Amino acid sequence: SHPDTLVFGRTPPLINTIEDRKRLISRLFGIEKVLFLPFDRAMMTMPWQDFIDDLLISTYGAVHLVAGHDYHFGHRNQGDPDKLLSRCRERGIGCDIIPQVTRDGITVSSTYIRTLIESGQMERAADFLGHRHCLTRTVTHGCRFGRTIGIPTVNLTPPDHVLLPARGVYVTRVFLPDGASVPGVTNIGTRPTVSDGDAVSVETFLLDFDGDL
């Protein structure tokens, strides 16, 4: 879960799911194995020294750490980049601190990227993310009305606590389970092809596609 869930009792919307994040890290950086550690009360109250020594080095065998310029860790966020660098030197492992990154004079941050996605500025969001925003979900079979008008549609159930772009219609590309991809047009909002009340849905019209999902 997001640290804010435990610390502040609220869950901010995530930019993507854990599964999507793993795939992105593997694809963009060539990392074969990605582990996400659950943030629980034990981790929240762990002294920053123990976080490095016992968890990262002893448990996971870390030999090189990479962190952002504003990274904080350990009980009450007492660990910071300077302490991380110093501790890594003492323990004989490598450490890199990534400096602040700006684009057009704006600091690249998850908070700003969330703002762009929420307002539907997907081109600019992609520029700050370094890749197109993506969402992986299992197809929800509906009434198959799209097929009756010659355009197959894919209905996706929005994941909990994951940020969706502003309501609207977007040009998209759909990646299928077999690795193929097809162009699509995605509507986020109430479903235009069938009445579904006020429930927010993600409905994609598949172009140049003839098959079953």
In which residue ranges do the predicted regions lie?
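Core alpha/beta nucleotide-donor-binding catalytic domains of modification enzymes
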Residues: 1-58
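Glycine-rich loops and low-complexity Gly/Arg-rich segments
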Residues: 18-23, 58-63, 90-92, 120-123, ...
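A residue-level signal for conserved active-site and pocket-lining positions in enzyme catalytic cores
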Residues: 25, 125, 172
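Active-site donor-binding loop signature of nucleotide-sugar glycosyltransferases
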Residues: 39, 100, 188
